[in-house]
Amino acid sequence: MATTYEEFSAKLDRLGEEFNRKMQEQNAKFFADKPDESTLSPEMKEHYEKFERMIKEHTEKFNKKMHEHSEHFKQKFAELLEQQKAAQYPSK
């Protein structure tokens, strides 16, 4: 059974959305486990703030890269479909 571009694209999008949702859930769990700020020393408070920023930045960078890779794979898949079509139905 041949996979269409639309099926391939939709599957990549679904996987990306699912992965993003799971990553957001993990981040939410981490942030929920943070101690009450009133119990933290100024140094630890600063440490947590830096760590939270780092997690958010890395999450954004990772999601951007995943999106770029997905778009690249979609483009390559479309090219392969065109090559397959050209091989099956060569111009005369």
UniProtKB/Swiss-Prot annotation:
Claim: tRNA processing is one of the keywords in the record: no
Keywords: Calcium, Cell projection, Cilium, Cytoplasm, Cytoskeleton, Flagellum, Microtubule
InterPro entries (alphabetical): KMP11
Location(s) in or outside the cell: Cytoplasm, Cytoskeleton; Cell projection, Cilium, Flagellum
GO biological process, alphabetically ordered: cytoskeleton organization; defense response; positive regulation of cell population proliferation
Principal subcellular localisation of the protein: cytoplasm
GO cellular component, one term: cytoplasm
Family: Belongs to the KMP-11 family.
Miscellaneous comment text of the record: Binds calcium.
Role description: May be involved in the regulation of the cytoskeleton through interaction with the subpellicular microtubules. May be involved in parasite mobility and attachment to the surface of the host cell. Behaves as a strong immunogen during infection.
Subunit structure: Monomer.
Protein name, per record: Kinetoplastid membrane protein 11B
The species this protein was found in: Leishmania infantum
Organism classification: Eukaryota, Discoba, Euglenozoa, Kinetoplastea, Metakinetoplastina
